[in-house]
């Protein structure tokens, strides 16, 4: 955790850079989130960093929940991302982390960058969520709004022989 504390601000910055440019913004994590999670869940939460010439240029966080490994948040240096395939390394390292941990049967990448994730063998699965507003009138509008939501279509790659 000492090294994580030392790079906490840099991780916050790298994650914010990705978050601010995202088309869909789900939840902005508070500053210090990654360091706090590593302390709060030491056996169920992992951070992996990516370094170039001694500088942290990216990271990914994993949360382990029984037999499922969830890739939660990541951060990348935008300039380095444009010159190196760091996002692909991040996806492949997630597979390695899942294989290294005993009992993991499923790796969940999330629903963004689906085409890139399919390049490493990821397959989309339906997600279900309960969406409810506290105000009953607004809750009826939520139903109408949710009907319009559909996953982004993408060209799925088949990296494994059928």
Question: For each predicted feature, which ranges?
Answer:
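A conserved beta-strand-loop-helix scaffold within acyl/acetyltransferase catalytic domains
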Residues: 1-82
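Short, flexible segments with low predicted structural confidence
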Residues: 5-6, 88-89, 145
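Hydrophobic alpha-helix feature that most strongly marks membrane-spanning transmembrane helices
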Residues: 16, 20-23, 39-42, 55, ...
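Short, charge-rich amphipathic segments
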Residues: 20-30, 94, 156-162
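Active-site/acyl-donor-binding loops of N-acyltransferases
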Residues: 52, 105-162
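Acyl-donor binding region in acyl/amide transferases
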Residues: 67-132
